[in-house]
């Protein structure tokens, strides 16, 4: 059964950095969730306007469908970056064919802010952090996953991530 790892958290938490490092270790398909947004969603976020549930649903469904397609093609693992802020959003992703795990990156907020302020050319702005924090719901008991609070270097975070993956007995 395909093991899907959703690297989740608010903007600037390091999702892409961790996902790319995981992809190098697991040699599996990787989807950058930002690439699945419509231009309208990107424009909205770029203007500092938070997305609503209606904006997010088709985006989440496209990610879910990509995950299921990878499972149908025999992928052992997949890695997806996605904020996955609400339980209801994660429920959509959990409909994918295979087993879905959430790796919630939750470094201190100042680390997120610093990363966001140093980004060049990304549509998300540091001003979006608060709206994402307001929306964020912690993982629930019915959701498989781990919360990683480290603000360390990417390789330190990867040790924790791979510890979780290996504990699943599926690496």
Where are these regions (language model features)?
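Walker A (P-loop) ATP-phosphate-binding motif of ABC ATPase nucleotide-binding domains
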Residues: 4
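Hydrophobic anchor at the beta1->P-loop junction of P-loop NTPases
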Residues: 7
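The conserved Walker
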Residues: 11
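Conserved lysine of the Walker
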Residues: 15
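Conserved substrate/cofactor phosphate-moiety recognition/catalytic segment
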Residues: 20-62
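Glycine-rich phosphate-binding loop used to anchor ATP phosphates in small-molecule kinases
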Residues: 54-97, 105
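Conserved phosphate-donor/acceptor-positioning beta-strand/loop module used by diverse small-molecule
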Residues: 96-115
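Small-molecule kinase domains that catalyze NTP-dependent phosphoryl transfer to phosphate-bearing small molecules
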Residues: 118-160
